[in-house]
Amino acid sequence: MAAATLLRATPRFSGLCASPTPFLQGRLRPLKAPASPFLCRGLAVEAKKTYVRDKPHVNVGTIGHVDHGKTTLTAAITKILAEGGGAKFKKYEEIDNAPEERARGITINAAHVEYSTAARHYAHTDCPGHADYVKNMITGTAPLDGCILVVAANDGPMPQTREHLLLAKQIGVEHVVVYVNKADAVQDSEMVELVELEIRELLTEFGYKGEETPVIVGSALCALEQRDPELGVKSVQKLLDAVDTYIPVPTRDLEKPFLLPVESVYSIPGRGTVVTGTLERGILKKGDECELLGHNKNIRTVVTGIEMFHKSLERAEAGDNLGALVRGLKREDLRRGLVMVKPGSIQPHQKVEAQVYILSKEEGGRHKPFVSHFMPVMFSLTWDMACRVILPPGKELAMPGEDLKLSLILRQPMILEKGQRFTLRDGNKTIGTGLVTDVPAMTEEDKNIKWS
């Protein structure tokens, strides 16, 4: 279990996990991609504004069970900050903007908004809570520097509360602030106190500092409707203060060659194709040559424009949620899961050795052990790929709750390097979390593995 703690506590590798990038609305047409409300309508015409980097940039997001009020809270934050010029108010309907989301009343794809407090500039990801859309939630949490866990006071922690916390911890999100929502629906203050106690115990269970974590009680709906100031506006202001102070500004790796996992691909009439994502490391400039790798593709092109939240950038830095206009490509040429890199800086790999923690039944993992050649799906960066697990010589079974060294062979070569985190899923269960320790060459035996 000590090794499991190590895997969960290791800081997120700088070349990992990008998320949906909020930038294209209006006439832009996504290609098999999540709704990404924040990138740039402005790429269709010349951008009118330039992004000014005058505050530290931090990526945060709302996580939690379906219908606990994540999107309502996101809307309330923008409404309150808009009054001081720190945001543009985004209504609930603008955040949940995909037709299926509106029809079902739930968030399916991670959506994004931008806002600023007095101290910081934030890109905020509103992650889906419904169990059917955990895959999109994994992508949503991947680039986050910290999370706001939303728990309804009238429900307490629920199944997706646990799963979201588990996924956030697995991909290296180390700081969580809690908002106990819908407090206006609970008359008994003791019930709210019990919910807070249960949340702190849950945080501790998943390796967070449960006793130290800020917990703010309030009502996002009251804040949106500007009633009951103590539970409404003041609670959201307290939450923002807690996010400012408890979630640290991360150290960004600006020295290594740029790496941008592609979250979405869009076509802009009259201009071309845009890829969106969070720059995981390095600096990306207008005019840079780049390669797009993965999924058996190797495409070379040039970045002809960069935008973030409808503002143009001459250069993007690690941590920025951006859209990059690429020369001479059609949206059909590209897909989510590709990785944009400096030419020659990295190559896809099909085999890795890794330290892997297999989740126990109590942690939501498998009930039974598995053998060599078991085939889960590996999630890393913005891609997912079927893989074969090869147990060490002499090892017949991998048991739930066990920490061990494994070899994993992917169905197709993808971007993988030492220190990279990944998650293993089997059906609708997260079954393991791992860290790449080596990237060996494929043997003849490896090449003959059957995938049917």
Swiss-Prot record:
Region (G3): 126-129
Family annotation (InterPro entries): EF-Tu_GTP-bd, EF-Tu_GTPase, EFTu-like_2, EFTU_2, G_TR_CS, P-loop_NTPase, T_Tr_GTP-bd_dom, Transl_B-barrel_sf
Coarse class of the protein's main subcellular location: mitochondrion
PROSITE patterns in the record: G_TR_1, G_TR_2
Superkingdom of origin: Eukaryota
UniProt-listed Enzyme Commission number(s): 3.6.5.3
CDD domains per the UniProt record, alphabetical: EF_Tu, EFTU_II, mtEFTU_III
MF annotations from Gene Ontology: GTP binding; GTPase activity; magnesium ion binding; translation elongation factor activity
Region called G2, residue ranges: 105-109
UniProt enzyme class: hydrolase
Region: G4, residue numbers: 181-184
List of residues that carry N6-succinyllysine: K88, K234, K286
UniProt keyword annotations, A-Z: Acetylation, Elongation factor, GTP-binding, Hydrolase, Magnesium, Metal-binding, Mitochondrion, Nucleotide-binding, Phosphoprotein, Protein biosynthesis, Transit peptide
Positions bound to GTP: D67, G69, K70, T71, T72, N181, D184, S219, A220, L221
Transit peptide start and end: 1-43
Family, per entry: Belongs to the TRAFAC class translation factor GTPase superfamily. Classic translation factor GTPase family. EF-Tu/EF-1A subfamily.
PANTHER family reported for this sequence: ELONGATION FACTOR TU, MITOCHONDRIAL, ELONGATION FACTOR TU-RELATED
Function summary: GTP hydrolase that promotes the GTP-dependent binding of aminoacyl-tRNA to the A-site of ribosomes during protein biosynthesis. Plays a role in the regulation of autophagy and innate immunity. Recruits ATG5-ATG12 and NLRX1 at mitochondria and serves as a checkpoint of the RIGI-MAVS pathway. In turn, inhibits RLR-mediated type I interferon while promoting autophagy.
Protein name per the record: Elongation factor Tu, mitochondrial
